[in-house]
């Protein structure tokens, strides 16, 4: 009974839809033309004409983008109120976040830290995060700023210049300790950022030992086979420590890229000298097997051994037709 009652309504909708679609298409075409005219008026700096055309685009999806172009091109004259109004109206759009980024940069350049705090919303770039901490410091919120500083400090690369004043204040407060310096040095080493690691090593509590560590890591990174061949004579690397095991696994992974066979031979000679963990073994054999598989080396499956299966083991088994 309900279907019979509603059927005329659906028939009416179907009969009307072609005309409605046609009207919408005409309106959309007109709006597109208005959009192009408004954009051209902006480019020609015809602001009165732009504003007149902009008002006629209510409901058009790209109306907000036009206003973004208008504000972004005039940030030096923009007010907090106009930017805030735009951000609220276009909240969630990509161009709202872009305008926020550019506006924050402008506020930071002018040291308008109170305004910066009002407009700041994460996530932001490292530079803008550090400007945020500068703003906190300028407003007397030292504790909050210093609580957020370690996250920006603990990166393997040189940090943005905007972070320098924050790091200086943090260090002056006695909060940049040796443990944090060492942690960052290790992050730099693991990211193969050797210049950065050397710089950081000099500021640790044991600069001589840590600079030697950086040199040792860089040596095994650049020429692993040479280090492995002279391992018996290398008193610092021959000790069975967690750090030495990590360096050796890194060297094996590097060597595997150049010669899986040499890497496997080195691994076979080295593995009994150290107390490698199961994960160490997996990482070493996975790297050797993967690079062998990439080279279509028939020994790839042997190099993988009995470690847990992975994508490259499956590929090697398929092209070798060995899926036992």
Residue locations for each model-derived region?
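Bacterial N-terminal signal peptides that target proteins for export
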Residues: 1-8
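Aromatic (phenylalanine/tyrosine) cluster motif
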Residues: 9-10, 21
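N-terminal signal peptide c-region/cleavage motif recognized by signal peptidases
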Residues: 16-17
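Alpha-helical solenoid repeat scaffolds
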Residues: 21-324
């Amino acid at each position: 009974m309900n279907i019979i009652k509603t059927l005329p309504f659906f028939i009416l909708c179907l009969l009307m839809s072609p005309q409605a679609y046609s009207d919408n298409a005409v309106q959309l075409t007109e709006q597109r033309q208005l959009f192009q005219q408004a954009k051209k008026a902006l480019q020609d700096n015809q602001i009165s004409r732009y504003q007149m055309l902009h008002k006629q685009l209510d409901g058009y999806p790209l109306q907000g983008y036009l206003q973004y172009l208008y504000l972004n091109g005039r940030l030096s004259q923009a007010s907090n109120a106009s930017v805030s109004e735009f951000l609220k109206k276009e909240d969630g759009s990509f161009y709202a976040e872009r305008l926020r980024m550019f506006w924050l940069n402008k506020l930071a350049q002018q040291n308008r830290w109170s305004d910066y705090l009002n407009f700041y919303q994460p996530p932001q770039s490292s530079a803008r995060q550090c400007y945020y901490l500068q703003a906190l410091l300028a407003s007397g919120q030292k504790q909050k700023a210093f609580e957020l500083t370690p996250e920006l400090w603990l990166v393997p690369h040189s940090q943005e210049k905007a972070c320098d004043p924050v790091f200086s204040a943090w260090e002056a407060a006695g909060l940049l300790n040796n443990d944090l310096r060492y942690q960052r040095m290790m992050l730099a080493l693991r990211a193969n950022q050797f210049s950065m690691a050397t710089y950081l090593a000099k500021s640790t509590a044991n600069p001589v030992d840590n600079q030697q560590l950086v040199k040792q890591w860089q040596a095994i990174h650049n020429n692993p086979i040479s280090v492995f061949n002279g391992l018996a004579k290398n008193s610092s690397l021959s000790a069975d420590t967690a750090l030495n095991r990590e360096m050796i696994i890194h060297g094996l992974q590097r060597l595997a890229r150049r010669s899986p066979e040499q890497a496997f031979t080195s691994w076979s000679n080295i593995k009994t000298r150290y107390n490698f963990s199961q994960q160490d073994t997996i990482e070493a054999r996975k790297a050797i097997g993967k690079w062998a598989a990439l080279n279509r080396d028939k020994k790839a499956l042997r190099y993988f051994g009995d470690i847990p299966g992975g994508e490259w083991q499956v590929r090697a088994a398929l092209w070798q037709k060995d899926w036992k």
